[in-house]
Amino acid sequence: MIKVYLGGIVSGLTYEEANSWREEAIKRLSCLGIIGVSPMRFKEYLDDEDILSPLGSSNNILTNQKGIFSRDKWDVRTCDIILMNLLGAKTQSIGCSMELAWANLLNKPTIVIMESGNPNEHAFIYQTADFLVESLLEALDTCESILLY
C-alpha cells in the first residue's frame, strides 16, 4: 500500500486543531486506496490537553519527547511521500523542519503547504519542498498526481 505522511504543526494547537485537517486528508486519500499516516494516531487522550506543548507530554510513551521523535522519524522513513502542512503557523516549527530534512536525506518526495508570510519561510524549507502549494486541496491533488498511474 502507498502511504503518505501527514506532517504539520502540532505545538501551540489544540488536539482538534492539529488533527482535523489530517482526518480530512485521510478520508480523501483512502478513497484512492492510499493510506494517510498521521502522527496524531492513537493520541486521542491529548484532547484533554488545552494546548499541545513542543516538549510533548510525559503521560504516555507515544507523547514523551523520545516517543514523538522516534515514531515520527519511523513514519517519515516508511512512508512513500511527505505532505507537510505549515498553514497558519504562528512560529517556526523545529519538528516540521526535522521531518523535511529526514525526507530530503531519504529522497522522499515532499509537498509543503505554506502561505506567503508564514514564519517557516526559510531557504531550508523552500529547498526541501519538491512541491510548494497553498491549500490542502492542492496538496492532495498533487499527491494523487504523483502516486497514481
Predicted feature locations:
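Conserved catalytic or regulatory cores that recognize and/or transform ribose-phosphate-containing ligands
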Residues: M1-Y149
